[in-house]
Amino acid sequence: MRSDIIKDGYTRTPHRSLLRATGLKDDDFKKPFIGVANSFIEIIPGHFFLNKYSEILKDEIRKNGCVPFEFNTIGVDDGIAMGHEGMLYSLPSREIIANSVETVMNAHALDALVCIPNCDKIVPGMLMGALRVNVPTIFVSGGPMAAGVGAKGEALDLNSAFEAVGAYETKQIDEKELKFIECNACPSGGSCSGMFTANSMNTLCEAMGVALEGNGTVLALTSEREELIRKAARRICEIALDERYQIRNIINEKTIKNAMVVDMAMGGSSNTILHMLAISREAGYPLDIASLNDISRSVPHITKIAPSLPSVHMQDVAKAGGLSAVINEIAKFNSDLLSLDALTVSGESLGDRVKNAEILDESVIHTVQNAYSKVGGLAILFGNLAEQGCVIKAAGIIGSRQFSGKAVCFNSQDEAIKGISKGKVQKGDVVVLRYEGPKGGPGMQEMLSPTSLIVGRGLGADVALITDGRFSGATRGLSIGHVSPEAAEGGMIGLLKDGDIIDIDVDKFSINVRLSDTEIEARRKEWKYAGKPVNSRWLRQYQKLVTNASNGAILEA
């Protein structure tokens, strides 16, 4: 056992003495030690109940002959951190979480790992840390939140609350209606109910085989989710000492592609691109961002979920057959798109896991013959405005997939929010929101507030937004993020001026500004960037080490 290094032999007398202080007895030193990486935190709706889930998990682990040791990571709620300087800390928290998992697991030589994430950066952070440790690992999330119910019986979610702000400002709703949405959009614990970043990443864990079936869709705070927790506990005890289930044997080149195929089929959050670029590097199989368009061209988009389709949420996907039904439908269309022989932590191949799954509601999970689009729900655009690429959630486009308009430039998210609220942005404009990339922010803030204001003010089909920052998974509309190179490193987005004409063609995967090479070079010579004052020591460290979005915004020392 890996843990023998801390518990076996006479030289480990002091180590065992310390472990006995935690309650261990003689027999416990013969058992596998299981790390339980929890992310319990009271301020996040998807996490305030995870302490109860970890108790269920640990109890089941003990019953099955292993010794659990729980530790916690930090967490940031992106919705609560949104629209103020707290969002500067969201993406950097991913690195802290990854480092925490690596540190605890390796410092104490634990044999296996169960991760209990749920929201936003916690899932990819734990994946990155687990890949560094490389022991048998199972992910079991807290589960999605149920959708809220509106005054007319319509589905509500967190995005409804953000867009309600713009609707209130333009007097489309009154204060009473605004308060009703506030009080009903998030009715229970769980990761926000649509195909936002958290549920996208939990779904991809299932697609990669590092989580059990149902991980992405079974609702939080249900008996079904509790049983999934117990199953994960029993299974980790079965595989704790089996090298076949080391996480790098589960997450590899084949299963990373499987994840991206599922991502395209379901129109996941654009943040999944950023995180999968980082995760693939930790796994030793770095994704080429340009290659993702090859997947997008091949995979039909068969499932639209909020925010792309506000009436459909994760609970509906669960009832319609779950992720297995989505994967099986894609496999029947073209089995070559997926590595169906890939091993999952349950011991079966991905193909065996999904082969009997059926679509139970074709209004939620479409057949390939009735796909929303013949191409995937995410796209990488290239051109003179983004030589290293940028990302759009094509599934969330409200209007045309082609757009040309005049640039309206803002040098920060705060500037953009004020400008949009004051009516500076009109139909036909392209909002340029820059100096918000990984280095420029620093921290690559999410731009849900500006995009929600645009949609809430009725401009969602008539205005595009491009940024070197990123978007919440709740974002919809013609919103293009992760522009690389970013403005702070001299990227073209930093050279744009008000009135420049920008051409976007999602079907051609292109984004360009109508400027000659001579004009671009002249502007580049004039460009100067002094940088923003950064008071936080941690954010200064992050700014110094972080790479741009085309590399997954990973840290390089």
From Swiss-Prot:
Binding-site residues, [2Fe-2S] cluster: 119, 192
Known partners and oligomeric status: Homodimer.
Active site: 472 (proton acceptor)
Keyword terms, alphabetized: 2Fe-2S, Amino-acid biosynthesis, Branched-chain amino acid biosynthesis, Iron, Iron-sulfur, Lyase, Magnesium, Metal-binding
Amino-acid positions noted as binding Mg(2+) in the UniProt annotation, renumbered to this chain: 78, 120-121, 446
GO biological process, one term: isoleucine biosynthetic process
Pfam families in UniProt: ILV_EDD_C (PF24877), ILVD_EDD_N (PF00920)
Protein name, per record: Dihydroxy-acid dehydratase
GO MF annotation terms: 2 iron, 2 sulfur cluster binding; dihydroxy-acid dehydratase activity; magnesium ion binding
Cofactors (names): [2Fe-2S] cluster; Mg(2+)
Function: Functions in the biosynthesis of branched-chain amino acids. Catalyzes the dehydration of (2R,3R)-2,3-dihydroxy-3-methylpentanoate (2,3-dihydroxy-3-methylvalerate) into 2-oxo-3-methylpentanoate (2-oxo-3-methylvalerate) and of (2R)-2,3-dihydroxy-3-methylbutanoate (2,3-dihydroxyisovalerate) into 2-oxo-3-methylbutanoate (2-oxoisovalerate), the penultimate precursor to L-isoleucine and L-valine, respectively.
Pathway entry: Amino-acid biosynthesis; L-isoleucine biosynthesis; L-isoleucine from 2-oxobutanoate: step 3/4; Amino-acid biosynthesis; L-valine biosynthesis; L-valine from pyruvate: step 3/4
Modified sites of kind N6-carboxylysine: 121
Protein family according to the UniProt entry: Belongs to the IlvD/Edd family.
HAMAP family recorded: IlvD
